[in-house]
């Protein structure tokens, strides 16, 4: 079971048993807080024996001797502390969280000698702890060692010692909102597909109303009235009805244009008639990672009271093979009026997105549109699971996204767009076809979407490699990563809040 933390901040802490976690700069002799937590200086001998050099994220676990103010001391190396950035502080928090087990309380000393760890560092450290503590264990029936008889997790009381308590508390309120948004996105991706269909997903988004988000849910009938033939074509093979969810957060000025985020929400993707291989198909419960990220982002923006008008639109469908399913060779008419020849029913995400993009642009006239989608396997071939693909018709927006990715370490790599690629999706029988063939697959998918954004600044993030099954690290031990929530929150915070 996952560990839960009750985190507080203090300038000093009275030590009386429990765990002390001390950060150690590779360039200093003693760890932070050593004078109070380790008066006997047992660290010096332990470090010498273990050849501990305080390399970044390395650790030394010490049982405190009789008479010590704490029961146990864990020293975590920071490397050269003067070089730490915001993401490094997140990772240190995650490393600390991973080592807190079987204790009721922990004091964490982060104010390194010669490197003042102010409120921002403390809040980032705490955010890293919250992100690392997450695990998806809803369907596990066996209790962990730290659980009570009812299976409830006993929270560990954590005090982070920092010289700037007021700033840490203020910034941590926003950090908690970010953590909650990421965790919501992770939960949605991790849920089994028999539990989370389009209707159930829409209900999860509807719950954001308690935070002040306005939520509308369009049914199949309403989408048909709007002419969303591309989205509805994907859904027609499933007994589960599709939904289009519109979330509005009005935190900016009354007449200020909103920023808009659109997510692909294929709650399960068999591939349809162009069916996928059986091996690994269970992972297609995560094919709604884009919609999950948008929902998590809207939670974060509302929970922290972001001073921006933001729109989140998610298209929710299930792609199933059935006697009524869409066929290769079908031609559908999108909301834009453009016709699409279906070449491969497994290239369905772009069909969902094209109607959602057109609807968003037509109704809200946003400053920009950013869509997120687990869209192509081709982006995995190109970038692996370390970076998401970025496609954009606007250099300023692309640069802002790239910069936000560097801050949050949710990194993006810009991919090309161009007329020669666009020609690859021309059709003999319709305005376009839904796949351009084997080569340049992630690019032709982006070119397809570009046909539905008109002149609005737009970016497409292909997160197929980063939303699920990505490399585990200090702040994520989950299959569903929640990729995109922190990235887009940073984008909004730095560039678009009034």
Swiss-Prot record:
This protein's UniProt keywords: Aminopeptidase, Cytoplasm, Hydrolase, Manganese, Metal-binding, Protease
Pfam families: Peptidase_M17 (PF00883), Peptidase_M17_N (PF02789)
GO biological process terms held by the UniProt record: proteolysis
Class of the enzyme per the UniProt entry, highest EC level: hydrolase
Localization per record: Cytoplasm
EC code: 3.4.11.1, 3.4.11.10
Reaction equation(s) it catalyzes: Release of an N-terminal amino acid, Xaa-|-Yaa-, in which Xaa is preferably Leu, but may be other amino acids including Pro although not Arg or Lys, and Yaa may be Pro. Amino acid amides and methyl esters are also readily hydrolyzed, but rates on arylamides are exceedingly low; Release of an N-terminal amino acid, preferentially leucine, but not glutamic or aspartic acids
Cofactor(s), names only, from the UniProt record: Mn(2+)
Cofactor mode of binding and number, as noted: Binds 2 manganese ions per subunit.
Keyword set includes Manganese: yes
GO molecular function, one term: metalloaminopeptidase activity
InterPro entries: Leucine_aapep/pepB, Macro_dom-like, Peptidase_M17_C, Peptidase_M17_leu_NH2_pept, Peptidase_M17_N
Domain of life assignment: Bacteria
Binding positions (Mn(2+) 2): 264, 269, 287, 348
Binding site for Mn(2+) 1: 269, 346, 348
GO cellular component: cytoplasm
Active-site residue list: 276, 350
Residues making up the signal peptide according to the UniProt record: none
Disulfide bonds: none
Family affiliation: Belongs to the peptidase M17 family.
Function recorded in the entry: Presumably involved in the processing and regular turnover of intracellular proteins. Catalyzes the removal of unsubstituted N-terminal amino acids from various peptides.
Protein name in the entry: Probable cytosol aminopeptidase
Species the sequence originates in: Rhizobium rhizogenes (strain K84 / ATCC BAA-868) (Agrobacterium radiobacter)
Gene that this polypeptide is encoded by: pepA
């Amino acid at each position: 079971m996952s560990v839960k933390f009750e985190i507080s901040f203090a300038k000093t802490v009275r030590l009386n048993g429990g765990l002390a976690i001390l950060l150690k700069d590779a360039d200093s002799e003693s760890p932070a807080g050593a004078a109070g937590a380790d008066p006997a200086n047992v660290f010096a001998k332990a470090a010498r024996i273990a050849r501990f050099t305080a390399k970044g994220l390395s650790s030394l676990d010490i049982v405190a001797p009789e008479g010590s103010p704490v029961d146990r001391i864990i020293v975590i190396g920071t490397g050269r502390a003067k070089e730490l950035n915001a993401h490094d502080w997140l990772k240190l928090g995650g490393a600390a969280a991973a080592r807190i087990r079987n204790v009721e309380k922990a004091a964490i000393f982060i104010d390194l000698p010669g490197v003042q760890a102010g409120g921002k560092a403390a809040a980032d450290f705490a955010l890293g702890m919250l992100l690392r503590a997450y695990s998806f264990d809803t369907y596990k029936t066996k209790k962990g060692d730290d659980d009570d008889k009812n299976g409830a997790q006993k929270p560990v009381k954590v005090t982070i010692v920092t010289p700037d308590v007021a700033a840490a508390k203020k910034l941590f309120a926003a950090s908690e909102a970010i953590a909650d948004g990421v965790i919501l996105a992770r939960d949605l991706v991790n849920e089994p597909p028999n539990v989370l269909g389009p209707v159930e997903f829409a209900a999860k988004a509807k719950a954001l109303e308690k935070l002040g988000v306005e939520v509308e849910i369009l049914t199949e009938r309403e989408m048909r009235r709007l002419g969303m033939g591309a989205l509805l074509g994907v859904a027609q093979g499933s007994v589960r009805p599709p939904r289009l969810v519109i979330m509005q957060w009005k935190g900016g000025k009354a007449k200020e244009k909103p920023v808009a985020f659109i997510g692909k929400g294929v709650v399960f993707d068999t591939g349809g008639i162009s069916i996928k291989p059986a091996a690994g198909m269970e992972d297609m419960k995560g094919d709604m990672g884009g919609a999950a990220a948008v929902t998590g982002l809207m939670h974060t923006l509302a929970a922290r009271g972001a001073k921006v008008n933001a729109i989140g639109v998610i298209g929710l469908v299930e792609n199933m093979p059935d006697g009524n399913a869409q066929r290769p060779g079908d031609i559908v008419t999108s909301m834009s009026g453009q016709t699409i020849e279906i070449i491969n029913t497994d290239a369905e995400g772009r069909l969902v997105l094209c109607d959602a993009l057109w609807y968003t642009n037509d109704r809200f006239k946003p400053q920009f549109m950013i869509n997120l989608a687990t869209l192509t396997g081709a982006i995995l071939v190109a970038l692996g699971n370390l970076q998401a693909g970025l496609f954009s018709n606007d250099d300023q927006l692309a640069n802002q996204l790239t910069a936000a990715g560097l801050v949050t370490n949710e990194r993006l790599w810009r991919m090309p767009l161009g007329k020669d690629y666009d020609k690859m999706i021309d059709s003999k029988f319709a305005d376009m076809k839904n796949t351009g063939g084997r080569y340049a697959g992630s690019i032709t998918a982006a070119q397809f979407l570009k046909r539905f954004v008109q002149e609005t600044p737009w970016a497409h993030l292909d997160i197929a490699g980063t939303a699920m099954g990505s490399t585990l690290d200090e702040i994520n031990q989950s299959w569903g990563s929640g990729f995109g929530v922190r990235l887009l929150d940073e984008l909004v915070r730095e560039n678009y809040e009034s």
